[in-house]
């Protein structure tokens, strides 16, 4: 045990209990003394980032791989820069703890006009700004620190959403009592009456269903239930698919797996398998505009049984107080009795384009990339042509597919990949980002080189903001960006870059380069030249829907 043991040490021990081995962030004068404890910690490694926004993205990527992450910023200027990333974690149910180093309590109580404040002697403005984007918050004091740390962390882990701790510089040094046991979160027991009512309603529905299908999405992953879903579809012969954020839940080789459902933009076999079913089991789904090609999904309440983290629905009736795991177990048992074989061959590729020769297009790029993916990869695709082009990729077992289509903050992927590679240093990380998106967060490539990471980064260069061009103003200069020499970027961001770079514009050349980088021996950056106006089918459908809604 570290002596003298203090609040800073208690917080670090609790981060370890939650599964974090690293702390991301940017130093500032209000968190420097806490950082001394981080550096001295045998369990937590400090990971400095280029800026607070990137640090928040990196923490998010880390948490999507490890289940939890922590982020450290300084009061005011630092925490506000990170709020965009924290908001994305909140929207997409990612538990990231935001620790803010703050001025000492005495200075706060005196209302001193300190730097990094609004100059009004008030120190709670930014705390209140964080309330809508975190599930639990606390201002730590000498008296409440240990209790509040545990309360915020357990709430985060239960709800799978971010939390916020304001840590005044002097409070971090105050004496604390070490925890006597590890921090654990026991799932709330199901309401037995509600669970029984749900079982009866679901049984009534499934017993008369001639065709049943399963549609899963990202909340299954957030609540650690991928294995339960995989077992379900192995034991019950039914058609199944995911939505974009849930890609990777199912193995592409599993009989009955159709691919990715995205409303009217779905491949025809996927659309028919899901929308043509009498009953669709929607597990952890969120039918957002970007996931459904502008709300074009054709699924009615009467047709669906829906399972969310803490409640479930049959038809129009909601049953509360039922944890997702117990709802899944209930439905799995019922399906074994009532679901008839509705499987289809699992070899539907999702790709309708036959050739991979000549100049690269969106179609030939994704078909070429498909042959490159292998089990165990971590794939991150940025909002735009990257994420929506990846919708038809068929993922083998144990692939983590990370996208952010609900929050949709471009640039997220590059920094999130830094966090993902930090969490999983021995796995192959593949980054798919547009040129416009990469310009927002490219500094973190320097951190990757510093830490000797070896991601494979594909920059899809279509000379600007292609999504915005598709929505409105295709030739307007506000959709243009500065044109960078991408293959020289690693040289600028490291004094001794261990990196290889290529620029490709032909499908054959891309295939050759991918073969060279397959073993990811060093950081690889591949600039992929694509036609300016070429966009994937889902993105085309989505942008038309978005433009129509914007003009309504």
What residue ranges belong to the model's regions?
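Hydrophobic "anchor" residues on beta-strands that sit immediately upstream
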Residues: 213, 378, 430-431
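N-terminal alpha/beta PP-like core and its mobile active-site loop of ThDP/TPP-dependent enzymes
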Residues: 1-338, 375, 454-457
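Thiamine diphosphate
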Residues: 99, 109-120, 328, 388-552
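Conserved thiamine diphosphate
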Residues: 65, 116-159, 340-354, 471-513
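Phosphate/pyrophosphate-binding active-site segments
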Residues: 2-3, 140, 166, 179, ...
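Active-site phosphate/pyrophosphate- and oxyanion-stabilizing loops and adjacent acidic/basic residues
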Residues: 36, 60, 128, 230, ...
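Active-site diphosphate/adenylate-binding microenvironment
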Residues: 8-20, 26-29, 34-39, 345-426, ...
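Active-site flanking residues adjacent to catalytic metal/cofactor-binding acidic residues
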Residues: 283, 307, 381, 434-435, ...
């Amino acid at each position: 045990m570290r002596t003298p043991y203090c609040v800073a040490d208690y917080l670090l021990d609790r981060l370890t209990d939650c599964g974090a081995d690293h702390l991301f962030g940017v130093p500032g004068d209000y968190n420097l003394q806490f950082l001394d404890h981080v550096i001295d910690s045998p369990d937590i490694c400090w990971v400095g980032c280029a800026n607070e926004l990137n640090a928040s993205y990196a923490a998010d990527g880390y948490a999507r791989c490890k289940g939890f992450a922590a982020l450290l910023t300084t009061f005011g200027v630092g925490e506000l820069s990170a709020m965009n990333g924290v908001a994305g974690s909140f929207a997409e149910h990612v538990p990231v703890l935001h620790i803010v180093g703050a001025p000492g309590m005495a200075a706060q109580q005196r209302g001193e006009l300190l730097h990094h404040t609004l100059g009004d002697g008030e120190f709670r403005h930014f705390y209140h700004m964080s309330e809508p984007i975190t599930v639990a918050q606390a201002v730590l004091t000498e008296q409440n620190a240990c209790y509040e740390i545990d309360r915020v962390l357990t709430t985060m882990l239960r709800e799978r959403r971010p939390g916020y701790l304001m840590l005044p510089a002097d409070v971090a040094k105050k004496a604390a009592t070490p925890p006597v046991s590890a921090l654990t979160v026991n799932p709330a027991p199901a309401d037995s009456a509600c669970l029984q009512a749900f079982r009866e309603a679901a049984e009534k529905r499934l017993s008369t269903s001639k065709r049943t299908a399963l549609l899963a999405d990202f909340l299954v992953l957030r609540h650690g239930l991928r294995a339960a879903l995989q077992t379900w579809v192995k034991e019950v012969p039914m058609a199944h698919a995911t939505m974009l954020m849930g890609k990777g839940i199912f193995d592409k080789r599993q009989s009955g797996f159709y691919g990715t459902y995205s409303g009217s933009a779905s491949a025809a076999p996927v659309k028919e398998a899901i929308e043509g079913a009498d009953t669709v089991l929607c597990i952890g789904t969120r039918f957002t505009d970007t996931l459904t090609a502008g709300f074009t999904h054709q699924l009615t309440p009467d047709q669906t049984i829906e399972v969310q983290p803490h409640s479930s629905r049959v038809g129009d009736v909601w049953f509360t107080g039922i944890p997702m795991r117990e709802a899944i177990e209930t439905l799995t048992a019922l399906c074994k009795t009532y679901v008839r074989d509705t499987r289809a061959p699992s070899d539907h590729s999702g790709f309708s384009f036959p050739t991979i020769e000549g100049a690269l297009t969106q179609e030939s790029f994704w078909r070429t990339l498909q042959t490159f993916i292998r089990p165990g990869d971590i794939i991150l695709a940025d909002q735009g042509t990257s994420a929506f082009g990846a919708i038809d990729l068929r993922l083998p077992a144990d692939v983590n597919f990370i996208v952010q289509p609900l929050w949709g903050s471009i640039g997220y992927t590059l920094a999130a990949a830094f966090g993902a590679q930090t969490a999983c240093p021995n796995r192959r990380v593949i980054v798919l980002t547009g040129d416009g998106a990469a310009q927002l967060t490219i500094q973190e490539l320097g951190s990757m080189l510093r830490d000797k990471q070896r991601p494979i980064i594909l920059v899809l260069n279509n000379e600007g903001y292609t999504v915005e061009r598709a929505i409105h103003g295709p030739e307007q200069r506000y959709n243009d960006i500065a044109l960078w020499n991408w293959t020289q970027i690693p040289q600028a961001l490291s004094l001794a870059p261990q990196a290889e770079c290529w620029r490709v514009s032909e499908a054959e050349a891309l295939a050759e380069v991918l073969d060279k980088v397959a073993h990811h021996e060093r950081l690889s950056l591949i600039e992929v030249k694509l036609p300016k106006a070429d966009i994937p089918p889902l993105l085309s459908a989505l942008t038309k829907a978005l433009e129509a809604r914007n003009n309504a």
